[in-house]
């Protein structure tokens, strides 16, 4: 089940409301990544406290560990991980793409060796839909082939990107057929592929519109291409996505990427960047980024960001966070993660308000000025 209501627009930016089986999601929204059914360093309670409305789980990794049989005993991923709000699961396509030499792609699906124990495994549109049915995620992604930016050390040609994209379209049809056969009560999104080629992206989108998914995602970006190529494709595809459906930009990215995405009609984002960077001591703030391990912070009494209302900024100094990071204390990773995710989710809230009030362009201008100021 999925209902998408468009509440306001400001240029191409959209303010909406997405209703799925486990609740209502205010868009545009950022989805923290919980690869193994856990957002690293965060409890479900802490996620709710920073206003996370939906999280992402990883079909491929959850299939390998703990396995579908375990999750099935709990009635799905929500019950298994103790999270009662919406969940989106990716299809496993990107993870299989990331295996490189360990996998073989055929029309039927992908044969690969488990990165855990070397077992021979097979993932196809049908298998991906079956796994996601057991996970009972609110939003299911079609199984696709993520077109690589580079093949054999050079950018993929139009012919290579076309071949990959057309197979993803055939897999899209098989995905929705299996989704319907299983009478899955949740929502299914299609994925626009086509590499760096606008005409292939158009062909992919047209094919997905014929299949009629509940929502549509842009895949195959942030896979090693130059930033200008990513923006070119985003600016071409984003405004062409169907107005009555939610738009999801997969695996992207920096705060600047989120603002650029919203400006081009994107409603949903996910990325490991705020959580992974937090564990590495890279913190995002309204006024630029902070690398907390730098010695300049060892006696800095200021909070990370005086304008931030997160638990870390309300209670601790940069000096203390520097100390925790240098000593490898687990609390450091936790506080850093709370801060980064709070910053990302607060940025989305500010964009929702700006779109509702018809001042999104002013917001973008102020956002860039603040970020350039330096923390």
From Swiss-Prot:
InterPro entries: ArchSynthase1/Queuine_TRR (IPR050076), TGT (IPR004803), TGT-like_sf (IPR036511), tRNA_ribo_trans-like (IPR002616)
EC number: 2.4.2.29
Main EC class the enzyme belongs to: transferase
Protein's UniProt name: Queuine tRNA-ribosyltransferase
Domain of life: Bacteria
Protein's organism: Herminiimonas arsenicoxydans
Pathway: tRNA modification; tRNA-queuosine biosynthesis
Xref: NCBIfam families: Q_tRNA_tgt, tgt_general
Cofactor (UniProt): Zn(2+)
Entry-linked HAMAP family: Q_tRNA_Tgt (MF_00168)
UniProt GO molecular function: metal ion binding; tRNA-guanosine(34) queuine transglycosylase activity
GO cellular component, one term: cytosol
Cofactor binding note: Binds 1 zinc ion per subunit.
Pfam families: TGT
Catalysed reactions, semicolon-separated: 7-aminomethyl-7-carbaguanine + guanosine(34) in tRNA = 7-aminomethyl-7-carbaguanosine(34) in tRNA + guanine
Binding site for Zn(2+): 308, 310, 313, 339
GO biological process: queuosine biosynthetic process; tRNA wobble guanine modification; tRNA-guanine transglycosylation
Known function: Catalyzes the base-exchange of a guanine (G) residue with the queuine precursor 7-aminomethyl-7-deazaguanine (PreQ1) at position 34 (anticodon wobble position) in tRNAs with GU(N) anticodons (tRNA-Asp, -Asn, -His and -Tyr). Catalysis occurs through a double-displacement mechanism. The nucleophile active site attacks the C1' of nucleotide 34 to detach the guanine base from the RNA, forming a covalent enzyme-RNA intermediate. The proton acceptor active site deprotonates the incoming PreQ1, allowing a nucleophilic attack on the C1' of the ribose to form the product.
Keyword Ribosomal protein in record: no
Annotated gene: tgt
Residues that bind substrate: 90-94, 144, 193, 220
Span list, region RNA binding: 251-257, 275-279
Keyword ATP-binding: no
């Amino acid at each position: 089940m999925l209902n998408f209501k468009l509440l306001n627009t400001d240029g191409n930016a959209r303010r909406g409301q997405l209703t799925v089986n486990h609740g209502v999601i205010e868009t545009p929204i950022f989805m923290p990544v919980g690869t193994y059914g856990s957002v690293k360093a965060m409890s479900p309670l802490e996620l709710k406290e920073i206003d996370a409305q939906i999280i992402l789980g990883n079909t491929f990794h959850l299939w390998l560990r703990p396995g579908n049989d375990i999750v099935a005993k709990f009635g799905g991923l929500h019950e298994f991980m103790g999270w009662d709000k919406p969940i989106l699961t990716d299809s496993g396509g990107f993870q299989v793409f990331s295996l490189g030499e360990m996998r073989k792609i055929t029309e039927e699906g992908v044969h690969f060796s488990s990165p855990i124990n070397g077992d021979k495994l097979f993932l196809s549109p049908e298998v991906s839909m079956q796994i996601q049915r057991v996970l009972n995620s609110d939003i299911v992604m079609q199984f696709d082939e993520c077109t690589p930016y580079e093949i054999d050390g050079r950018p993929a040609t139009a012919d290579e990107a076309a071949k990959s994209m057309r197979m993803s379209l055939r897999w899209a049809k098989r995905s929705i057929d299996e989704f319907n056969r299983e009478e899955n009560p949740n929502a299914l999104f299609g994925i626009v592929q086509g590499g760096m080629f606008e005409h292939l992206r158009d062909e992919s989108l047209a094919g997905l519109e014929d299949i009629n998914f509940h929502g549509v995602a842009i895949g195959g970006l942030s896979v090693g291409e130059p930033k200008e190529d990513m923006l070119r494709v985003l600016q071409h595809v984003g405004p062409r996505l169907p107005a009555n459906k939610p738009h999801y930009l997969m695996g992207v990215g920096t705060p600047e990427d989120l603002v650029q995405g919203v400006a081009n009609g994107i409603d949903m984002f996910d990325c490991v960047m705020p959580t992974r960077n937090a564990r590495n001591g890279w913190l995002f703030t309204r006024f630029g980024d902070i690398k907390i391990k730098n010695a300049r912070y060892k006696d800095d009494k200021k909070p990370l960001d005086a304008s931030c209302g997160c638990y870390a900024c309300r209670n601790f100094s940069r000096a203390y966070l520097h100390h925790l990071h240098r000593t490898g204390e687990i609390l450091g990773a936790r506080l850093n993660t709370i801060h980064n995710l709070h910053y990302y989710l607060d940025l989305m809230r500010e964009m929702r308000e700006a779109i509702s009030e018809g001042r999104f362009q002013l917001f973008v201008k102020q956002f860039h000025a603040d970020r350039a100021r330096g923390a």
